[in-house]
Design a protein with these regions (language model features):
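Conserved mid-sequence domains
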Residues: 103, 110-112, 119-123, 895, ...
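Hydrophobic, well-ordered secondary-structure elements that form the walls
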Residues: 458, 517, 835, 871, ...
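Conserved P-loop NTPase motor core
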Residues: 1-640, 645-657, 711-712
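Short Cys/His-rich zinc-binding micro-motifs
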Residues: 966-985, 989
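Extended, charged helical/alpha-beta scaffold domains that provide interaction surfaces
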Residues: 35, 314, 330-338, 344-352, ...
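Short, Lys/Glu-rich amphipathic helical modules
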Residues: 453-460, 464-466, 719-721, 725-728, ...
Length: 992
């Protein structure tokens, strides 16, 4: 109530923000006459002038009005598109690092040119992020004309580019690409062995188109680069066979109380909770599963710790059979399970569910099971995009998620007013009792509107529902085809497989009499023009003429093949002479103008929504397809009490409301109270989904800090300067050799503290163990050392002299340059192998951490503690393995080297790894797809006294024994325990 009163008095926050931005628009408009008077060369020269002013210290905010005026004029000259005042406001919002909500058809693509140009003047690169390759390519070519006219370079990242092409694209002033490509390039860069092979050059400023889709809808799906694990696939088939023999219990709908849940458990072997999307074995189900899997279980019980992996397989098989449905959540294409995006309905080839779920679905569908993958690198979109120093976004629907944008990304949402008043009529929802009644009413509505000539766009929630509706329309005389409108009694269905073809269909959805069925988000990014899009129609005509000339007679069936038409289109279009194209275009332009007026007279595009989505934002996106730029239009949602949202989240409130209003068979209820009740249910779901995403982010933030630490270390190794912090937070940069010496000294100090400490009596020392550990870590033969009469400091000094001499000898024989390259490659491989194992450990930790809640402990706090302990242990292993590998290396003498591999004269001799164990693998003998060739390594036979194993990368041997001590270790850079305030190595550690 108070908020409403304040809003009336001082205006809403959005209104106040718009008020602050309007003077900027006035300044841009004031520059327009002078900028218009410039010649093309003078206008182009403004870019060099702006760059110089930035170099001289002028702020971008000061340049903004004039720079925006320059871009506006370039748009007018090159594209015949002049930025509206509201688009200037949108550009200013993006430049300030906020989200601009602009309705469909308001020209978001053109708006992005303003802040992209302005921020590119600094020379650090601007990334414009889109949802698919087609839009990235289209926008880079379309808007790229403005940038190139002004002397800026434009690049586009496509999924099939090689690294050299990606480097060129990222080196451009402005780079277009998809969220997936930007994220994967970041991960791939941090797996490379040469800085020169990196493709990205930093994360300065990103403008995210369809920001809600990328930062919210896809936030729960991390980007993962993985490699095959070794686990057999037999268990998936075995577990899958038992699921059909389990009896399904009653389905839990809504929130069930404990006693209700207990009663439901007696109805079958498993119960399905629709609201929380879980499926759980009951007591009888557990007993049956144990009987059927008796041969696999270690012991008698499925829930025993040693059977945890089998329990995991059973859980995933249940989810695959009960929760995941064919043609809704996935499709089977050419013997492969392909995921369907739950928000867009698009197929996502190449994407796989993790944790064995994808394999469980493959077993269910009786297709080949691909081996489970092990994660090599991963990042969520949330943490990737938070790397940018400045982030902005634009979409038609962000205000309903403003809280999430603010809390997760620190992004404010500003709603930009439309250039023309909205004329779309949003009709109240029609609610039916059953799904059958609803679908019959939808078909009748579509047929009736089509007879009038009014274009209809139907939004469905899944491919399955699209196909169902298409079949029903076929029966009513509206046949399925590859085109619609223009007087034909046909409809088209977007299967959301080819984005370019999808855009062509959506562009024609405004033609007179057109009927288009699409999943809710299909074709996003393409304007629906009333009367049709002449440019797209001209392309289609060119395609048809080329097909008529080149397609053999009798093969016309290929015209119904969407894949054939799509790939043929690109080649065919470029064969058409320009004069012919312009003639065809003019013909369709006149036709579209006539149809435009006819469709406006019919009240514009009519949106028919077949179901409410869990998020109001998705519903608003569908509504927003009608009524662009002041055009007329209408929308209506058709619902039934059997819809998922109504059944699961609507609770008894809506059902009670329906009874009060009275429901008869086939007669819908149309009432504002029902619509508001449904929106309340949607808000409840949105809140729940936000909590899930926030919860996942809190866990991922822990890994993100560790990932940044490891990636920073990798880069420092590549740069040859590794930075260490002292107790005062001061950084010291060490070259690779200095860093290795520091590590080796720390390890030796730890060994001395453990086995020959100053504070312990001689009788307590374990010199045999010290000798074994020194041999294990440094590869030294300590058999001739006699420490009997030496002090702790003298022992340390003797050992360090030998350790440092052995490394100096390597460097002397092979040269610093060769050894430095070997150091770098070995360090990188050890870091990568240990990081991979650490990710695996974190996955296992996360799986079971939720159980800590039963012990009255916060799982998140426990996860932070244990993951930190795992990370510290991993870093200790990395340090020790690096030292072990590099100290075990020794040069191959010419007489030892095989003739075929003997080094040429005057070349430094290559290095080998002492290999007492025949099964040990050289670090550089592993797969080196990402690594450059280094000095050759081979194996040598051990001397009789050498019984220690050299290190290995990966596997169990990658986890060498960590030195344990009763007292805390005093590092060389730690404060001295004597209390002097000096570093230990400058005080009592000086002699060491």
């Amino acid at each position: 109530m108070l908020d409403t009163i304040l809003a009336k008095v001082v205006g809403t926050q959005n209104e106040r923000e718009l008020k602050r931005l309007r003077p900027i628009v006035a300044e841009v408009n004031a520059f327009e006459p002078a900028i218009k008077a410039l010649s093309d060369d003078q206008l182009r020269g403004k870019t060099a002038e702006f760059r110089q002013r930035v170099a001289n210290g002028e702020m971008l905010d000061e340049l903004l009005p004039e720079a925006f005026a320059v871009v506006r004029e370039a748009g007018r000259r090159v594209l015949n598109m002049r930025h509206f005042d509201v688009q200037l406001i949108g550009g200013a919002v993006l430049h300030k690092g906020k989200i601009a909500e602009m309705k469909t058809g308001e020209g978001k693509t053109l708006v992005a040119t303003l802040p992209a140009y302005l921020n590119a003047l600094e020379g650090n690169g601007v990334h414009v992020v889109t949802v698919n390759d087609y839009l990235a390519r289209r926008d880079s070519e379309w808007m790229g004309k403005i940038y190139r006219f002004l002397g800026m370079s434009v690049g586009v990242i496509q999924h099939d580019l090689v690294d050299a092409e990606r480097q060129v694209a990222y080196a451009s002033d402005i780079t277009y690409g998809t969220n997936n490509e930007f994220g994967f390039d970041y991960l791939r860069d941090n797996m490379k062995f040469e800085l020169a092979h990196y493709v990205q050059r930093g994360h300065q400023f990103a403008i995210v188109d369809e920001v809600d889709s990328i930062l919210i809808d896809e936030a729960r799906t991390p980007l993962i680069i993985s490699g095959p694990a070794e686990e057999s696939t037999d268990l998936y088939y075995e577990v899958d066979r038992i699921i059909p023999r389990l009896k399904a219990g009653e389905v839990i709908r809504g929130d069930a109380k404990a006693e209700e849940r207990e009663a439901l458990e007696s109805t079958g072997d498993f119960i399905h909770d629709e609201k929380h999307k879980t499926v759980t074995l009951t007591e009888t189900g557990i007993q049956k599963a144990e009987q059927m899997l008796a041969g696999r279980l270690n012991g008698g019980h499925l829930y025993d710790l040693e059977n945890a992996h089998i329990k995991h397989h059973v859980d995933q098989a249940l989810r695959a059979h009960v929760i995941f449905h064919r043609d809704v959540d996935y499709m089977v294409k050419e013997g492969e399970v392909v995921i369907v995006d739950e928000f867009t309905g698009r197929l996502m080839p190449g994407r796989r569910w993790s944790d064995g779920l994808h394999q469980a679905v493959e077993a269910k569908e009786k297709v080949k099971i691909e081996r489970e993958n092990q994660t090599l690198a991963t990042v969520t979109f949330q943490n990737y995009f938070r790397k940018y120093k400045k982030l902005a976004g634009m979409t038609g629907t962000a205000d309903t998620e403003a809280e999430e944008f603010n809390k997760i990304y620190k992004l404010d949402v500003v709603v930009i007013p439309p250039n023309r008043p909205l004329r779309r009529v949003e009709n109240p929802d029609l609610v039916f009792r059953t799904e059958t009644e609803k679908w019959d009413a939808i078909v009748t509505e579509i047929v009736d509107e089509h007879k009038k000539g009014r274009p209809v766009l139907v939004g469905t929630v899944s491919i399955e529902k699209s196909e169902k509706l298409s079949t029903m329309l076929d029966r009513r005389g509206l046949k399925r085809g590859t085109t619609t409108g223009g007087g034909a009694d046909k409809h088209v269905v977007l299967n959301a497989k080819y984005h370019a073809q999808e855009a062509e269909f959506v562009a024609q959805a405004g033609r007179k009499g057109a009927v288009t069925i699409a999943t809710n988000m299909a074709g996003r990014g393409t304007d629906i023009l009333l009367g049709g899009n002449a440019e797209f129609m001209a392309r289609q005509q060119c395609l048809a003429e080329q097909i008529a000339e080149r397609l053999p007679k009798g093969e016309e069936r290929f015209l119904e093949d969407e894949q054939f038409v799509y790939f043929f289109h690109i080649d065919a279009f470029y064969r058409v002479p320009k004069a012919d194209y312009h003639r065809i275009f003019e013909h369709f332009r006149r036709q579209c103008e006539i149809e435009h007026e006819e469709v406006i007279a019919l009240d514009g595009l009519h949106i028919v929504a077949t179901e409410r989505h869990e998020a109001r934002r998705i519903d608003n996106q569908l509504r927003g397809r009608a009524g662009r730029q002041g055009d007329p239009g209408a929308s209506r949602f058709y619902l039934s009490l059997e819809d998922d949202l109504m059944r699961i989240f609507g609770s008894d409130r809506i059902s009670g409301l329906m009874q009060k209003l009275g429901m008869e068979e086939g007669v819908p209820i149309e009432h504002g109270m029902v619509t508001r009740a449904i929106e309340r249910a949607q808000k409840q779901v949105e809140s729940q989904n936000f909590s899930v995403r926030k919860h996942l982010l809190e866990y991922d933030d822990v890994m993100n800090k560790q990932r940044e630490n490891i990636y920073a270390l990798r880069r420092q190794i590549l740069e040859g300067q590794i930075r260490l912090q002292d107790e005062d937070g001061q950084e010291t940069a060490l070259d690779t050799r200095e860093y290795l010496i520091e590590l080796a000294e720390d390890i030796l100090d730890a060994l001395i503290d453990t086995y020959a400490a100053k504070t312990a009596d001689f009788e307590e020392w374990d010199l045999d163990a010290l000798n074994r550990e020194v041999t294990r870590v440094f590869g030294l033969d300590t058999g001739n050392f006699d420490f009997a009469d030496q002090t702790s400091d003298e022992i340390r000094d003797t050992l360090w002299t030998k350790i440092s001499e052995s490394y100096d000898q390597k460097e002397k024989l092979v040269g610093r340059e060769v050894l430095q390259r070997v150091e770098r490659d070995i360090m990188l491989q050890i870091v990568d192998a240990q990081w991979k194992d650490h990710l695996y450990s974190l996955d296992h930790l996360k799986e079971g951490i939720g159980l800590r809640g039963y012990g009255q402990r916060d799982p998140l706090i426990e996860y932070k503690k244990e993951s930190f302990a795992l990370f510290q242990a991993m870093k200790e292993r990395v340090d020790e393995e690096i030292v072990r590998y590099l100290w075990w290396l020794r040069p191959i003498l010419n007489e030892e080297a095989p003739i075929a591999r003997r080094p040429a004269a005057r070349r430094p001799p290559p290095l080998i790894l002492n290999d007492p164990g025949a099964e040990s693998a050289s670090v550089l003998g592993a797969s080196r797809a990402q690594a450059p060739q280094a000095s050759p390594f081979t194996r040598s036979q051990p001397q009789p006294q050498q019984q220690q194993q050299p290190p290995r990368v990966g596997g169990d041997d990658a986890l060498p024994k960590t030195v344990r001590r009763d007292e805390p270790k005093v590092g060389r850079n730690d404060p001295c325990p004597c209390g002097s305030g000096k570093k230990y190595k400058k005080c009592h550690g000086a002699a060491a």
